[in-house]
Amino acid sequence: MPLTTPTAIFLMGPTASGKTDLAIQLRQTLPVEVISVDSALIYRGMDIGTAKPSAEELALAPHRLIDICDPAESYSAANFRQDALREMADIIAAGKIPLLVGGTMLYYKALLEGLSPLPSADEKVRSEIEEKAQLQGWAALHQELAKIDPLAAQRINPNDSQRINRALEVFYLTGKSLSELSQQKGDSLPYQILQFAIAPKDRSILHDRIALRFQKMIEQGFQQEVEKLYQREDLHLDLPAMRCVGYRQMWEYLRGDYDHDEMIFRGICATRQLAKRQITWLRGWKYPIEWLDSLAIESAKQTIIHAVTKISHSNS
């Protein structure tokens, strides 16, 4: 009897679309274990502003790959792929189906397609580039990048120091340009993937949900959560954790950049922009994907159950 490729489920969608609620219901019905695919939920101490599942929700459906990093730590798509593959293998070994839930599309892409063989960050090289920038300015380093990697220089704004640094770092470490290395792909995913995306059919409903959820976060103590982070000397707005939507706006409010009402307005706008980017990415997704309606959760659940049952029968 030939070995069958194991099944995994992707449940994607924009922020505030109801992914967590649906995942919890699926966990009660199907032999699945949940893996979070969210670049904000990885951070400890960032619970309210990330809409992290509550203790009650996690008791019903434990999520792997949440609370695995301190906000000061870096975590890449490559880190996620390595961690997710380990968790998926562990779930399959237990006779269950991995259910990957979240809205960080870059993580899904890395998982499906593998990653180009880019070197890990090297603090010594990065520091040398920073020192060079202090002497010459980032515009001069952008010109240097244009000679090494014209394609990357076209994509990267001359003021985007972080991306200029990374592109130069890659060249200094490997002798090859970022553009050249990015064209090389890694290993594909050894799973049969059922891919679903959930969102309301009417975009205005999602906008309303985002506004209501942000207001609820404020009521739940989001400001106090960010104040604890703000008081830490090792955290700043250049860190990925502090650039998460909502956190940046609250941080800037605490710094005195604008008043409370403006912070709420900017936080809601930033979250809506994130949702728009997520939907745009999903609309352009090159893999087969079935769309589910956020306002018809029972129907969405039955659609996924039917797909899993069908594939299980075909593999048996």
Curated annotation (Swiss-Prot):
EC number from the UniProt entry: 2.5.1.75
Chain positions of site Interaction with substrate tRNA: T104, R126
Region (Interaction with substrate tRNA): 38-41, 162-166, 243-248, 276-283
UniProtKB keywords: ATP-binding, Magnesium, Nucleotide-binding, Transferase, tRNA processing
Binding of ATP, residues: G13, P14, T15, A16, S17, G18, K19, T20
Catalysed reactions, semicolon-separated: adenosine(37) in tRNA + dimethylallyl diphosphate = N(6)-dimethylallyladenosine(37) in tRNA + diphosphate
Tree of life domain: Bacteria
Molecular-function annotations in GO: ATP binding; tRNA dimethylallyltransferase activity
Cofactor (UniProt): Mg(2+)
UniProt-annotated binding residues for substrate: T15, A16, S17, G18, K19, T20
Any one of the GO BP annotations: tRNA modification
Family indicated by similarity: Belongs to the IPP transferase family.
NCBIfam families in UniProt: miaA (TIGR00174)
Assembly information from the UniProt record: Monomer.
Role description: Catalyzes the transfer of a dimethylallyl group onto the adenine at position 37 in tRNAs that read codons beginning with uridine, leading to the formation of N6-(dimethylallyl)adenosine (i(6)A).
Name this protein carries in UniProt: tRNA dimethylallyltransferase
Organism: Pasteurella multocida (strain Pm70)
